[in-house]
A protein has these predicted regions:
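Anion-binding alpha/beta catalytic cores of soluble intermediary-metabolism enzymes, centered on
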Residues: 1-266, 271-336
Length: 336
């Protein structure tokens, strides 16, 4: 069974309630229908019920009726969620009138449904920008305990079985924080390891990547990686992590043994933490395009409950996979 199938099966075995705020978006609705057909998750669609069911009929989506459909402009908990938002944001000057307006926004409403305990995760972004998706998540759900930095991981399914776990690698940050400081980079390492375990089922072996291996080069950007490694070890002493390592030393046993003898990670890494967003974004796209790897994500991490962001160029299959991944993150969050 391939990894995506394993992710889907784990979701089926422990169904989570996933909110889809873009309930009338075509790819989202078609993926939702397949999720409901396959029994992968319980779905909450936000939007006008008549419009959603009309589109489902038009597109031949016979299982959308199995979803819970909530109209942001008319539902029983509207005032309850507005009061919750007002309380959460009162120090920022939120009024009840302002909260009542924001509750009509599906992206805010979805996060409030999660915060109230009425859902387990959210997926959006087929229509909305990353900023629009993240803003309510950070205002309402907030970051996970001990974490101040949201980041994004990419699941890479490569054709190099000698690397990672039979070619499976997880890389972060590829999506959110442009130039992390040492503390943020340590948090990215911790969160990417958690994502690797929760989503890919890996026993994380984390490499902090650089252009230097164990002091082979001197530069302030190398110093940042070394400091981040120290902080990450303090945050999670049980985590298998090492650095700084060049990419070949992290992935290739022969090179790892030569450049970093005695390292438990060198040549065996399945989680790659890059020093900045620029490196992460370029790297995964090179692996995807030149190495013909399958890149799944980005998977947002560091938020107290899973909220994921789609590319506006996503396919129906992308939405399907990300619903299953969001469900896996929700399962892991409950187990912590």
């Amino acid at each position: 069974m391939d990894l995506i199938s394993q992710i889907v099966e784990r979701a089926k075995a422990n169904k989570q309630r996933i909110v889809l705020p873009e309930g009338t978006e075509e790819r989202t609705l078609k993926a939702a229908n397949q999720i409901l057909t396959d029994g992968v998750a319980e779905l909450i669609l936000l939007g006008n019920p008549d419009e959603i069911m009309g589109l489902a009929k038009e597109w031949g989506l016979g299982n959308i009726h199995k979803a819970t459909i909530i109209d942001p402009e008319n539902h029983p908990k509207q005032e309850e969620y507005a009061q919750l938002l007002c309380e959460l944001r009162k120090k920022k000057g939120m009024t009840i009138e302002g909260a009542r307006k924001l509750v009509l926004n599906p992206l805010y409403l979805g996060c409030l449904i999660i915060k109230a305990g009425d859902a387990d995760g959210q997926l959006a972004g087929a229509r909305n920008t990353t900023g629009d998706v993240l803003r309510p998540a950070l205002q309402i759900i907030k970051t996970a305990p001990g974490i101040t930095c949201v980041s994004g991981a990419m699941l890479l399914l490569t054709h190099a079985p000698e690397c990672g776990d039979n070619g499976v690698l997880v890389m972060g940050d590829v999506a959110v924080t442009p130039v992390p400081d040492a503390n943020q980079l340590a948090q990215i390492a911790i969160c990417t390891a958690q994502t690797a375990k929760a989503v890919a089922g890996l026993d994380p072996r984390v490499a902090m990547l650089s252009f230097s291996t164990k002091g082979s080069a001197k530069h302030e950007v190398v110093d940042k990686v070394v400091e981040a490694l120290k902080i990450a070890k303090e945050m999670d002493p049980a985590l298998k992590i090492d650095g700084e390592l060049q990419a070949d030393a992290a992935l290739v046993p022969r090179v790892g043994a030569s450049k970093a003898p005695g390292s438990e990670i060198a040549g065996k890494a399945n989680v790659l933490v890059v020093p900045c967003l620029e490196v992460g974004n370029i790297s995964y796209k090179l692996v995807e395009r030149l190495g013909h790897a399958t890149a799944v994500g980005p998977i947002l991490q560091g938020i107290a409950r899973p909220v994921n962001d789609l590319s506006r160029g996503c396919s129906i299959d992308d939405v399907y996979k990300m619903i299953a991944i969001t469900a896996n993150q929700a399962i892991a969050a409950k187990a912590q």
